[in-house]
């Protein structure tokens, strides 16, 4: 399994269990997820290692809740955040500088294609700004990558967009 981590915050963003494809001439990775529902808070008696008490009503004190969301977000503990268009422009400008700096250190051959492609991709993001939900890694580092969540034309299938050069891969 390959875990994709944010190059800046080192937060886990997604893994290779999803359908991943390169978009925007290899600048971004598009990761397709699905809507899932999970029950949380319900404790299975077999995990306790004892018998259920014969006293009192069954299940007293434990309430279960069903949480519905996008599997990528839930599995990797991504945190939703929000931006105005102006705030996103400021964030993305600083983020691009950070990634450019990392690329200059680690992969200088990627600097020019990244900066050229990123400018085009940012125009596309800003043109479709109202369609996106924004997610950051579990540690909520404001300097880290902000992943974009959108839905396919069917309105049901979620997908997320990540800047490929802002990710590091870790084999597990």
From Swiss-Prot:
It comes from the Eukaryota. Keywords: Calcium, Cytoplasm, Phosphoprotein. GO terms for cellular component: cytoplasm; cytoplasmic microtubule; extracellular space; multivesicular body; spindle pole. InterPro entries: Mss4-like_sf, Mss4/transl-control_tumour, TCTP, Translation_control_tumour_CS, Translational_control_tumour_p. GO terms for molecular function: calcium ion binding. Residues 70-172 are annotated as: Required for reduction of TSC22D1 protein stability. The modification Phosphoserine is found at residues 46, 53, 64. It is found in: Cytoplasm. Residues 1-172 form the TCTP domain. Belongs to the TCTP family. PANTHER family: TRANSLATIONALLY CONTROLLED TUMOR PROTEIN-RELATED, TRANSLATIONALLY-CONTROLLED TUMOR PROTEIN. This is Translationally-controlled tumor protein. It comes from Bos taurus. The lineage of its organism: Eukaryota, Metazoa, Chordata, Craniata, Vertebrata.
